[in-house]
Amino acid sequence: MPKYRSATTTHGRNMAGARALWRATGMTDADFGKPIIAVVNSFTQFVPGHVHLRDLGKLVAEQIEAAGGVAKEFNTIAVDDGIAMGHGGMLYSLPSRELIADSVEYMVNAHCADAMVCISNCDKITPGMLMASLRLNIPVIFVSGGPMEAGKTKLSDQIIKLDLVDAMIQGADPKVSDSQSDQVERSACPTCGSCSGMFTANSMNCLTEALGLSQPGNGSLLATHADRKQLFLNAGKRIVELTKRYYEQNDESALPRNIASKAAFENAMTLDIAMGGSTNTVLHLLAAAQEAEIDFTMSDIDKLSRKVPQLCKVAPSTQKYHMEDVHRAGGVIGILGELDRAGLLNRDVKNVLGLTLPQTLEQYDVMLTQDDAVKNMFRAGPAGIRTTQAFSQDCRWDSLDDDRANGCIRSLEHAYSKDGGLAVLYGNFAENGCIVKTAGVDDSILKFTGPAKVYESQDDAVEAILGGKVVAGDVVVIRYEGPKGGPGMQEMLYPTSFLKSMGLGKACALITDGRFSGGTSGLSIGHVSPEAASGGSIGLIEDGDLIAIDIPNRGIQLQVSDAELAARREAQEARGDKAWTPKNRERQVSFALCAYASLATSADKGAVRDKSKLGG
């Protein structure tokens, strides 16, 4: 029978000092012996996805204590990728994932907490907490802040839906008037919550559902809706049950590594491909799998991408649907239901509610359930009122979207495409693979060949795009922006958005060893591995080289002979200490980022730290 971890600090005469300090936090004699549960919050006023979380930790804590536990809350950092985008701040985004994971480990292990409720939401916070949860392997439930409502405005006498990416594209489009750009900017992000499309934050919150670590509805129920409060209340009650099951009944099925098994990871990736999730999810799932000591690799993702169709299409891949529409159609469980009926899921998995996949679908799939309360929950909709307050409205759709032929979520027979929304490509400068969000690629450019325009920083590429130096047919190559080379693996949302602003969205390709925002669409290929700074062949591409992209056949090829590439590699190596570094790039890199770069692996490994470099 496992011993409560917290007993280390609450029992025994020699722990009198620790108990004295616990008493100073409000604990009493009656609390010693109860499980101590960490409420891991991420409130900050910097991030709209987290601005409403200040009081939500208290909601969870009250339920924990009512159920017989002791709740202790702490906060992690949270970086807003949208605000950090397009300048030096983006260097810090991906490294913050490791800081978040480490800080959770530090706090939980330093104070011997028994379990956790993780209150996350945005891009690197959910992955960082997920990595920590699987590293620590103590009972955990995730409950995120929820998606933002889609923006809406009237343009050309038509009401259209908007999001952050629209504001970025129109702001850089010389054909758009100042007044229209201002109107879109003011309408794009109307409420608290994670940005309203299937961007990285919402993708990851959906994947925690598929992994079994959060409750049904977690990925899609709006941040502003009153129904979302119940997820927080339930999480506080349920975590005490899970904790007691493990420590008092020796039930290891309550542990995250047993819930988020390899079968669950395969289900999560299957969901990701079917819903056209952010390419960043590949990085984060690979990283989380390593923390769980699960053998889940790019090869597994490649195999899944070849058989899973696209059953859901959401912004940025279409302007018709946002997360509020996914929820109306049944949310994550709705997509999983269609995948299950197509025979594409592992059914022998459980979630934090203790339900198997078939049991979860029977109760929560809107196409199966007889529970009116569940149907009512999935009718929770937007109010269209600007607010930063959680649970501030109770609007509902008149009906569910259960149209699996033409609705937001489709059945296998009516799939958006037989190929899924993500694909892994391999070739002579991406030997370990690269990732493309096929959901956002127009059919006309699934095969594309063009001359390379090579840039050794995102900034130079942006200047060239806006300066008219990139023309139709070009393949923009941005290198030395990987985990080590950036350092920090910047997102390339501005270059891809500006290509659209310049009318080149369907006329050019962009390839990088960096990564893309979940808001990116178009022929944008990232995560090229090995990265240039690690000696990857992307560092050998020269202006004018022809690059052939073949998404249907999963290929990407630099049309240069092996002999020529060998000669270029020899010349690169001859640069000595300057080999595999960008030429003529001035970038101030802090000690903190240098420390990250010194251990960073390429994207095919999840951009995690290379433990072999630490010795031991």
UniProtKB/Swiss-Prot annotation:
Keyword entries, A-Z: 2Fe-2S, Amino-acid biosynthesis, Branched-chain amino acid biosynthesis, Iron, Iron-sulfur, Lyase, Magnesium, Metal-binding
Binding note for cofactor: Binds 1 [2Fe-2S] cluster per subunit. This cluster acts as a Lewis acid cofactor.
InterPro entries: Dihydro-acid_dehy_C (IPR042096), DihydroxyA_deHydtase (IPR004404), DiOHA_6PGluconate_deHydtase_CS (IPR020558), ILV_EDD_C (IPR056740), ILV_EDD_N (IPR000581), IlvD/EDD_N (IPR037237)
Residues given in the record as Mg(2+) binding sites: 81, 123-124, 491
Family, as annotated: Belongs to the IlvD/Edd family.
CC cofactor: [2Fe-2S] cluster; Mg(2+)
Catalytic residues as annotated in Swiss-Prot or TrEMBL: 517
Subunit and interaction comment: Homodimer.
Modified residues (N6-carboxylysine): 124
Organism listed in the record: Shigella flexneri
Record keyword Magnesium present: yes
GO biological process, any: L-valine biosynthetic process
UniProt-annotated binding residues for [2Fe-2S] cluster: 122, 195
Reaction(s) catalysed by this chain's protein: (2R)-2,3-dihydroxy-3-methylbutanoate = 3-methyl-2-oxobutanoate + H2O; (2R,3R)-2,3-dihydroxy-3-methylpentanoate = (S)-3-methyl-2-oxopentanoate + H2O
Record-level GO cellular component terms: cytosol
Pfam families: ILV_EDD_C (PF24877), ILVD_EDD_N (PF00920)
Protein name as annotated: Dihydroxy-acid dehydratase
Free-text function comment from the UniProt entry: Functions in the biosynthesis of branched-chain amino acids. Catalyzes the dehydration of (2R,3R)-2,3-dihydroxy-3-methylpentanoate (2,3-dihydroxy-3-methylvalerate) into 2-oxo-3-methylpentanoate (2-oxo-3-methylvalerate) and of (2R)-2,3-dihydroxy-3-methylbutanoate (2,3-dihydroxyisovalerate) into 2-oxo-3-methylbutanoate (2-oxoisovalerate), the penultimate precursor to L-isoleucine and L-valine, respectively.
EC category: lyase
Pathway note: Amino-acid biosynthesis; L-isoleucine biosynthesis; L-isoleucine from 2-oxobutanoate: step 3/4; Amino-acid biosynthesis; L-valine biosynthesis; L-valine from pyruvate: step 3/4
Cystine bridges: none
